[in-house]
Amino acid sequence: MNEWSEMLVCRDYCALMMRDRKECDARCCRDGEGERVRARERLDATVAGLTELEYLRQRQELLVRSVLSCPEAAGQDKPCLTVDDSYLNTEEKLLEENILLLRKQLNCLRRRDAGLINQLQELDRQISDLRLDTETSHEHVETDSRPSSGFYDLSDGASGSLSNSSNSVFSECLSSCRSTTCLCTPLDTSLCASEGRLKPADDPGSCAECDCHCEDSSSGTVRRSLSASYSPSPDSSCDGISKFHCDLIAKNGNDVYRYPSPLHAVAVQSPIFIQSMTSHLKDDCNFSKPGEALNDEQKPEQVVGSQTSSWHASQMLPNKKLDSYIYGLLQRRAQPLRTNKPRTSINTDPSKSILRQASLCSRAPASVQAQQWTSDLKPNWQTCLQDASATSTEPSTASPQRQWSAESKGGTPQNGAYLSSSQPQNSYSTTNENTNCLLKKKVSGTSKGQLLSATPKDCPDLGSPKAVSSPKLNKHCFYNVEDNKTGQAMKASPLKRSPKTQTSLSCGKDSEQLAQELVSLGSSSQSQDEGGPLVSAQYIPAQKQNVNLQKGGTKNIKIVKVKNSASSKSRPQVFEHVSETVRDKHRTGSRRTRQVDEVHHLHKSSKKASAKTKRIPASIPEGRILERHTSSSGARSSAQRHHGHHRHHEAVLAKPKYKRNDFHRRPRGLHEIPYEEAYRRAHRRQKREMLSHMYLPSNAHYTSPYAYVGSDSEYSAECASLFHSTILDTSEDERSNYTTNCFGDSESSASEADYVAESSTSSDSEGSAGVNWRQISQAGSGSHGMTSAQAKAFVKIKASHNLKKKILRFRSGSLKLMTTV
């Protein structure tokens, strides 16, 4: 038993050992196989890498050899380039072929379009030649006054020929009837044909049905609907006939044919479009007034084959005829006057409507032109006149303004406006005549009641806001007049001017008067200085001109040379006295007007005209400055300078010569300064003039010719007007050695000899005292030929120290200024 059991145990053990060995062998085999697979893969990768390296080596070898052997390289590169070029050429050829094909297709489409258009035109001609079969309504046609039952051919403008033209959509004019018959629309006849008869022309319902299209040539009256009881205006001349001018919409609503279209000639008659057109027009009628159903409820024509078709619009025919007849009766009784503006209009082409009813709206263009002229005139002329009349304080200025307003409405724009003259020429008892408002200056002028012959280009609209803002554009009106003016004309007084001279200078004078009024608005009394100083000049006769000028007791002495007069005419001696009360009164308003004046002085080059007006006798109003000083710089010849030392009656306050030469610069725009500001400044100026008249002789008039300044230099705008009221002009003798233009005015090179002689010291004095400035003229100078009999004068100038500092800051290069506090 034991042995048997041991044998069994040994067998089991052996079996287990065998099994374990097999498993171990199997595991070893699996592991070895996996390792073999991995080794094979590694070897394959290595071989592949070696192959790639070999390929790269061979390729590199080929490249090196190709580079080393040039003939071989050329032979090898050429085929490559040829291949590339052939590829590109193939693409280009394909593109070119495609382009050519597209062009051919486009040309074919164009030819097809042209063929379609030709076919449509041919169809249109054939339709025009068609005749209706009117046997069913033959008896009605015999009673008709028309020779046949056809339609009027509207495409033949006003010819009155009869045909059944369904192409009336292309008609441009409404034909006149040959007799007292009505021109019924093709729609009316087609509707009647569907009922079995043709409408006679004398049928009241027929007339009322188409009363928008009726025209009675014998009586000259036109029967219209109640809603259209007015002559047609250009934008609603014939709403009824405009039914064919609408866009065509298909039943499905997808296809829309804009008018005008070649399809209108045929498609408008097709039933495909009738329903949509009718509903479209009915929708429009729902929004219009009841009386306008006649105008808007117009329906397109029908083809002969579709005349017997019943469509829902014919159901409304009895009611529509009744309403139309009632409206027609009311229209014949009374036509209330109404403006030429329609209530509604479905007309999309007003120009064609004008042509259609040209006989009914013949007066419309005239009314439109009148409205345009009135609307253009009122804002420019009348508004400014009303604003100016509001600023007036005396009745004497309101009358000519109203007169000018009335005359300007009736005047023609080609000839300008009639100018009324109520301004006294010599008497200045009413200061408003010269100082109140700008428009008074422009109205009065120098031509008393004379009609300006200048065109609107040469003499711009004086009433416009541009004209009262700045005299820039007005300058060109008198440039040429200045150059051609002689000394004889300058000597003549304003009252003794010849009519020829007045005519030639009228535009220039009015422009200069406007410019001078604007010049005066920024006068020295309206100080831009922060302290509000006033510069006053007093003329003292019978004094020696050659005098040394001193500032204080210890200041350097400076010689100031004064330029001689530019003309040899003798003027009455006048003394101007400006009181301290005037100075104090206007000092208070200086700060208030500084901003306006700064805007006024920003446009510096537009203000050169004031430089020409520096020597003005006090008896001449500022509006006359141009008449006295219209000679150009070329007119200042040596002969005129020879007699130019009559300085006792002239204001010597002047700008430098090189600034005055800038007078001939190009004029600029007139839109910078609003005319309300100009009117306010004119009002302030009027107050100053009224106060100054209390201290002036009856025949004297205080002028401030340098209240208005212009230059291109960068001197301060705040002290610009006062600066030109305090500087002395330079002399024109051989000693004037100041030849440099410190502000770069290239136009002043011709007058460099006129600059002031520069002193070696400046006058930036802090404690300057009162100084009398005397005019230094070279007595006995051969170049001037001064005689002892000529009058002597000197000017006493007072200005604040603050103003002096500002002037010297910007002007120290051309003059030395001595001021007193």
Curated annotation (Swiss-Prot):
Pfam families: Dapper. GO terms for biological process: negative regulation of canonical Wnt signaling pathway; negative regulation of JNK cascade; regulation of Wnt signaling pathway, planar cell polarity pathway; Wnt signaling pathway. Keywords: Coiled coil, Cytoplasm, Developmental protein, Wnt signaling pathway. Residues 288-312, 386-432, 564-615, 627-655 are annotated as: Disordered. It comes from the Eukaryota. Residues 388-400 have a biased composition (Low complexity). It is found in: Cytoplasm. A motif (PDZ-binding) lies at residues 818-821. Residues 401-432 have a biased composition (Polar residues). Residues 88-136 form a coiled coil. Residues 584-593, 601-615, 639-649 have a biased composition (Basic residues). GO terms for cellular component: cytoplasm. InterPro entries: Dapper. Interacts with dvl2. PANTHER family: DAPPER HOMOLOG 1 (PTHR15919:SF12), DAPPER-RELATED (PTHR15919). Belongs to the dapper family. The C-terminal PDZ-binding motif may mediate interaction with the PDZ domains of DSH (Dishevelled) family proteins. Involved in regulation of intracellular signaling pathways during development. Specifically thought to play a role in canonical and/or non-canonical Wnt signaling pathways through interaction with DSH (Dishevelled) family proteins. Binds to dvl2 and may regulate the degradation of ctnnb1/beta-catenin, thereby modulating the transcriptional activation of target genes of the Wnt signaling pathway. Seems to activate the canonical Wnt signaling pathway. This is Dapper homolog 1.
